[in-house]
């Protein structure tokens, strides 16, 4: 396979359709253990029909919101929107209706494509989004006043069939979506940051941002690899690496229908690759640990299947012990680093080139430097700005450089090392700067620590910990708070006084998290 870099999403989809037309592009469940598939040729055709339907509604170039779980109709909608010259605004399906409507108003949305499970959003949008002109339902039972996506696709297919029987076929073809050029530097997607603190911002990403980010590095993913997609579809990491990267190499994308059924769906779809956040990886690690003592190949077959070989991890810090654990079963865990503002990958680890403690090597289309300890990056993946937020854009971008807000540096070979977030820095009474993430990462290596948040409280450093009760029970720990204090005391012995944790708080519940499973910090 000759590897190529693409500059528009439309190029990726066209390449996939031309090269892998009869291969399965998407597989999804239609019952407990039944699967249906759609080919690359089918999704290419359906997305073109949807592009044409959008144009006939007068919405070409419009901002179109997408609200739904990962599904075949969601993918058809997204490709139909961006390949037809409009702007997709994917939103978190789990957000309250009021918040979704606010985001649609802020993004100047004039058309909404929505899943049937959010009929409450349809009602709210009709009442509170005056600019909204059309609502299209992706489901089988559209709410009152909604257009049916299925009917729009069928009608457009019929229109094309009629046109192609007439003598003006060539003239008509000139006006179809398939002949229209897409500007690589045109805005195509607005993604709202989930944000661990503060107001979410609409990140403006161009065709080039997304297409080049997904394809600028040949990660040696085999053609037609089977990928199980478990991350939220509105999340940049899923969109770029599961979908766009997957389409560029002809992968079969299998849709996980629930986070409660990941283990079952691994057995059903038999994937080779998965993109995950550390919380998910830790959950699967427990299944491996529960089978300790059995031959590695037996355990791997039971949990993942013999064909499974790679996990890409991103979104948060991953305890290195888990990388070693999965390696014993012949599974590579490759870490990456990125942010929505970079579409989203900045650096990634590949199996043949790794360095201890690094989050990965810069992508070929990216350069980085450290300014006063903060990592700045520049390249074709960097956003054009925040939608209608000029002050925030000016604060984030300087001469093409994106200020990541992360504390870190890059070595001579382009490997990135992180120490924390600039905005989370704790300034001690004697003027020392302490990165809470640095402390959190060290404490997280202890199995009794399920989740931890470090902050300043009344002039001292405090660690709030949600313990791993399952591990405590398994290992016979009766006094969990006392054992956690021992962990804190052990940590304190090895660090300077200004980095020591002087207060421990034990939680009874998990921390609230963002859609990408990051712990929410206080404003």
Model-predicted regions and their roles:
Residues 21-24, 137, 157-192, 199, ...:
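Conserved pre-ATP/AMP-binding loop-to-beta segment of ANL
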Residues 26-58, 62-71, 75-79, 96-101, ...:
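Conserved AMP-binding/adenylate-forming core of the ANL superfamily
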Residues 37-41, 188-214:
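Conserved AMP-binding A3 loop
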Residues 44-49, 184, 203-223, 230:
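Conserved structural elements of the adenylate-forming
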Residues 95, 112, 379, 385, ...:
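AMP-binding/adenylate-forming catalytic core of the ANL superfamily
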Residues 211-226, 233-298, 302:
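Conserved AMP-binding/adenylation subdomain of ANL enzymes
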Residues 272-276, 286-354, 450:
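Gly/Ser/Thr-rich phosphate-binding loop
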Residues 354-356, 382-405, 436-441:
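Conserved ANL (AMP-binding/adenylate-forming) active-site segment centered on the GW(Y/F)…HTG consensus within
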């Amino acid at each position: 396979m000759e590897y190529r870099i693409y500059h528009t999403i439309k190029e990726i989809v066209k390449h996939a359709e031309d090269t892998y037309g009869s291969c399965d592009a998407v597989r999804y469940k239609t019952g407990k253990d039944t699967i249906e598939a759609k080919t690359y040729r089918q999704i290419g055709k359906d997305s073109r029909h949807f592009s044409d339907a959008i144009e006939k509604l007068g919405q070409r170039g419009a901002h179109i919101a997408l609200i739904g779980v990962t599904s075949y109709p969601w993918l058809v909608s997204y490709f139909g929107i961006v390949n037809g010259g409009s702007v997709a605004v994917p939103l978190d399906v789990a957000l309250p209706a009021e918040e979704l409507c606010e985001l649609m108003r802020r993004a100047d949305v004039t058309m909404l494509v929505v899943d049937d499970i959010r009929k409450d959003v349809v009602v709210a949008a009709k009442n509170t989004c005056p600019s909204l002109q059309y609502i299209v339902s992706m489901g089988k039972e559209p709410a009152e006043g909604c257009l049916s996506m299925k009917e729009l696709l069928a009608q457009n297919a019929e229109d094309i069939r009629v046109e192609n029987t007439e003598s003006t076929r060539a003239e008509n073809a000139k006006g179809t979506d398939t002949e229209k050029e897409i500007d690589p530097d045109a805005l195509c997607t607005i993604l709202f940051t989930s944000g661990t603190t503060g107001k979410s911002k609409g990140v403006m990403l161009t065709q080039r941002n997304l297409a080049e980010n997904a394809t600028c590095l040949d990660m040696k993913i085999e053609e037609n690899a089977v990928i199980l997609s478990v991350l939220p579809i509105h999340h940049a990491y899923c969109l770029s690496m599961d979908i766009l990267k997957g389409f560029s190499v002809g992968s079969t994308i299998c849709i996980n229908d629930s986070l409660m059924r990941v283990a079952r769906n691994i057995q059903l779809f038999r994937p080779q690759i998965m993109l995950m956040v550390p919380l998910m990886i830790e959950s699967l690690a427990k299944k491996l640990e529960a089978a300790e003592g059995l031959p590695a190949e037996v355990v791997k077959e039971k949990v993942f299947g013999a064909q499974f070989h790679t996990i890409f991890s991103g979104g948060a810090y991953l305890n290195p012990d888990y990388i070693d654990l999965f390696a014993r079963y012949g599974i590579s865990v490759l870490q990456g680093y990125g942010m929505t503002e970079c579409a989203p990958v900045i650096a990634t680890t590949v199996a043949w080139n790794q360095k201890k403690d690094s989050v990965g090597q810069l992508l070929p289309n990216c350069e980085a430097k450290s300014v006063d300890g903060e990592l700045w990056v520049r390249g074709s993946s960097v956003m054009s700005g925040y939608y209608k937020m000029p002050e925030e854009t000016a604060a984030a971008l300087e001469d093409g450089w994106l200020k990541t807000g992360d504390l870190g540096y890059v070595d001579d070979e382009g490997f990135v090392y992180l120490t924390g977030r600039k905005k989370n820095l704790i300034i001690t009474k004697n003027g020392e700067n302490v990165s809470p993430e640095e402390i959190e990462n060290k404490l997280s290596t202890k199995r009794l620590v399920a989740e931890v948040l470090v902050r300043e409280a009344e002039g001292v450093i405090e660690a709030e910990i949600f313990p791993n009760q399952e591990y405590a029970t398994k290992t016979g720990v009766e006094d969990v708070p006392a054992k956690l204090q021992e962990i804190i005391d052990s940590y304190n012995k090895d660090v300077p006084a200004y980095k020591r944790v002087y207060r421990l708080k034990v939680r009874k519940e998990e921390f609230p998290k963002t859609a990408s499973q990051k712990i929410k910090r206080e404003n």
